[in-house]
Amino acid sequence: MQIAPISRGDVWQYKELRQELETEAGHINGLYSDFDWTPIRYLNRGFNRKILAGFFRRSQIGLVTPFRDGMNLVAKEYVAAQDPSNPGVLILSQFAGAAEELDGAIIVNPYDIEAITEAINISLKMSSEEKLHRWIRMIEQINEFDIHKWSKNCIKAIESITL
């Protein structure tokens, strides 16, 4: 399932990318769909947090691959929503700020399609023990470096500036 809410809809590059994605998803679905199965569920709208958390919790893989991003809270939300008895695997762009913190994720270059394909393959074959080990590392990181610690670190960094 690809959830793709409209973001920056007034930027022509985003409009162009959205058109490419929609065309490609339609092409793939046209080739491989059956009357009772569709390979890509492309949802071009947003969902409330509760529904998103449910999607995240049920998914085997979270694929978060921005070309450029700040912290990227979606990656952290994916980790936080996981069922500890059967967590999914996070595949994360090296260009997301969260990649520095979430060392249990499989880190990929989003421009390298083969690397993403390999990461998906690794994720699907990963043992339950390794999934759990990776998830524990990430959830501990998220719990330790929460908004309060982040804000204290920001204030400390600002106070250390000398003019």
Task: Give names to the regions the model predicted.
Residues 27-36, 81-86, 130, 163:
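Secondary-structure transition/capping motifs at alpha-helix termini
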Residues 147-163:
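C-terminal alpha-helical cap of glycosyltransferases
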Residues 8-14, 133-134, 157-159:
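Hydrophobic, well-ordered secondary-structure scaffolds
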